């Protein structure tokens, strides 16, 4: 975990835990193991603060042009980070080369090159076709938890992986922090929290299911 990052509601960032890990490490590990056994984290550990960051120079009067980032407590991120480190080593074998995001050794420019190659091939061989560009709106926030559990099962992840996901996301709450004001906390019922080390890997696994369905449909 990187230093000098904005902390969650606890106010303690990764720097604090790194300095005092010899004193706190045992308690952190014990707390996470207890959470797994009881299938429950304390309400404060799952709290997040949502702050919105503008997307480039796009008009800021539209909500869609803001990117919500959730500031999470460090203990929570230590737990999800451990699971993320275990999952990401498997992803290159599970995720098709068409997906180039979030995976080490893959470059998004390869997809741009692929589009040019397809255009050249169709023109050279006089093949009619169409390119459809689809963008997920609020992609991370729209994934249902039941679908995430089904996805983990479809890729034959151990039941403990799904249990960990449910431990971290069940009963999670967030509040919006903007312009010096803080909203009331509200319950989160879907999506992967941007700011969670695990979220990007969960998302590309879910997106891979869509890719598989497209590959299996020979009419596309």
Give the label of every model feature segment:
Residues 1-3, 10-220:
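Nucleotidyl polymerases of mobile genetic elements and RNA viruses
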């Amino acid at each position: 975990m990187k230093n000098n990052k904005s902390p969650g509601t606890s106010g303690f960032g990764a720097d604090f835990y790194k300095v005092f890990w010899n004193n706190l490490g045992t308690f952190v590990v014990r707390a996470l193991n207890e959470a797994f056994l009881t299938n429950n984290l304390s309400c404060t550990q799952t709290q997040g603060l949502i702050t919105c960051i503008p997307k480039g120079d796009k008009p800021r009067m539209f909500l869609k042009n803001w990117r919500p980032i959730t500031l999470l407590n460090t203990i929570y991120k230590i737990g999800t980070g451990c699971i993320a480190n275990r999952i990401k080593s498997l992803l290159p074998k599970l995720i098709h080369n068409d997906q180039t995001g979030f995976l080490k050794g893959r470059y998004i420019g390869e997809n741009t090159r692929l589009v040019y190659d397809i255009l050249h091939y169709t023109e050279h061989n006089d093949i009619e076709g169409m390119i459809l560009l689809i963008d997920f709106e609020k992609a991370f926030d729209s994934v249902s938890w039941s679908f995430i559990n089904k996805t983990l099962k479809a890729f034959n992840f151990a039941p403990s992986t799904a249990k960990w996901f449910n431990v971290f996301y069940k009963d999670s709450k967030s509040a919006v922090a903007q312009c010096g004001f803080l909203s009331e906390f509200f319950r989160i019922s879907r999506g992967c929290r941007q700011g969670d080390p695990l979220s990007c890997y969960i998302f590309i696994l879910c997106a891979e299911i869509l890719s598989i369905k497209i590959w299996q449909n020979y009419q596309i």
